[in-house]
Amino acid sequence: MFGRDKIQIKTPAQIRHMRQAGLVVADIHDALKAAIAPGVTTAQLDEVSARAIEKGKAKSNFLGYYGYPATVCTSVNEEIVHGIPGQRVLQDGDLLSCDCGAYVEADGVQWHGDAAFTAVVGNYASETDKYLDRTTERALWAAIAALAEAGVSGWKDARINLIGDAVESVVFDAAQETGHELGIVEEYVGHGIGTKMHMAPDVLNYSVSSKG
C-alpha cells in the first residue's frame, strides 16, 4: 500500500514542523475524548475533529484522501479500522477507535501528523473487553519503550522489527498470565510519515523472523 520507497530522513527543523502537526493531532484527540459519550453519533465526532483542526490552523489529511469523506475514522467494536463516521449512535460499553490526522505547511511543503487511540464509551461491557483494551495499551507502551531504549543506545544494532517483537511479547505474556489468548491483526500495518501521511517503512505489529 505504501510502496517500497526509501525511508525519509528528516532534519531537526523538519522534525519541528512535524511536531507542530502532531500537537494539532493531540488537540484533536483531546477534543474527541471529551465528546465521546453514550448517545453521541460518530458523525458528531467528525464535526468535533474538524473544528479542532480548524482551531489549530491546520488542514485534514484524511478528508478527501482517496475520496474519504471525513476528518476522522471511527471504528466501533467489530470494526477493526477505517470506520466512516455516520449516524451510528454510540452505546454504553462500545469500544471505539478514533484515527485522525492533520498537516501543516512550511515553505510550500506539507508536514503530516497521524495517530489513533481507543476509548471505552461509558463503562466496559465485559471484563474481556477491559482485558483487550488494557493489554493493547500495554503493548503500545512496550513498543514505545523499545524504541526509546534503542535511541538511548544510539540505535546500535536496532531494527524496525523490535516494535513487533515488543507487541507480540506483551500479548504472549498476557495469555500466559491469564489463560486468555488475544490475536494480533496482521492484515494492516503501521507506517512512516513525513511529507506524506503514508510513507516507508511498513511497521509490523507482530514478530517476524527476518531483520530489518
Residue ranges and their predicted role:
Residues 1-212:
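Active-site neighborhoods and metal-handling regions in enzymes and metal-associated proteins
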